[in-house]
A protein has these predicted regions:
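Active-site histidine-anchored catalytic micro-motif
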Residues: 1-230
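Long, Lys/Arg- and hydrophobic-enriched amphipathic alpha-helices
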Residues: 224-244
Length: 244
């Protein structure tokens, strides 16, 4: 299934991806010697593509053959994890990792844009990349920790966590709300993660455990909201990207 959130013409999609990944950002709080994962939004590329692209631009010269992508479910409610059964973009089909240890028996889901929107960027990094696309339903803190431990049993993997930030708030209120969310994410604040206004709070719970177990620290790359992009500040959606 092709995605309505980005261009469906291969040449046009490549052009947009090249533009979105053109700028390699400087990390505000120091250099990252080794990149283990990123946190990125999943809105339409015209809204959040540059924020996502800056995170992926840091991976341009990295050798990445395998990635786990985790994003929230927008279309059905469930507990735990599901896996996308197939992924195809205008740039080609993606090989789904079927033998990723600890995740072999998950139920399959046909589509989820929070994952699918990341795939063209990954294909620009490595057209032959293999992906484990995990849709995250509701999870407890204990289960989030167990999922993180299982993920870490598989070596040489890039982790991608997908979330947008606040939804449909006036501009100033959104900025204030998102600043708090940014602090919670960067401080790996388990106690407050359920409070945040972000659709990917459950994937972020897993991210926090992953980072705590490995002593990784998320560092903000860029924050904007849709009001910065469209000029309409009456009701906006927040977007941020991080690297760890």
């Amino acid at each position: 299934m092709y995605n309505k959130w980005y261009p469906q013409n291969k040449n046009e999609l490549n052009k947009v991806l090249n533009e979105d990944m053109l700028e390699i950002p400087k990390i505000k709080n120091g250099k990252i010697k080794e990149i283990h994962g990123i946190i990125v939004p999943h809105a339409g590329y015209e809204f959040s593509g540059t924020i996502t692209g800056k995170a992926f631009s840091l991976l341009k010269n990295k050798k990445i053959n395998k990635s786990v992508v985790l994003g929230p479910s927008h279309y059905i409610g469930f507990y735990g994890l599901m896996i996308l059964e197939k992924i195809e973009t205008p740039l080609g089909k993606i090989k789904i990792i079927g033998d990723y240890e600890g995740f072999e028996t998950l139920k399959k889901l046909e589509y989820e844009h929070s994952l699918d929107n990341q795939i063209p960027f990954l294909q620009k990094i490595n057209p032959k990349i293999e992906v484990l696309p995990l849709v995250v339903g509701e999870v407890s803190d204990t289960d989030a920790e167990e999922i993180a431990k299982k993920l870490l049993e598989n070596k040489d993997t890039l982790f991608i966590f997908s979330t947008d930030l606040s939804h449909f708030l006036p501009y100033e209120q959104a900025v204030k709300t998102d600043r708090q969310t940014i602090k919670i994410i960067e401080n790996l604040d388990f106690k407050r993660i359920r409070e945040i206004d972000a659709c990917g709070r459950f994937p972020l719970m897993i991210m926090m455990h992953l980072c705590r177990l490995k002593d990784w620290k998320p560092k903000l790359i860029e924050y904007k909201n849709s009001g910065d992009i469209t000029g309409d500040k009456s009701s906006v959606v927040g977007y941020g990207s991080w690297v760890f």
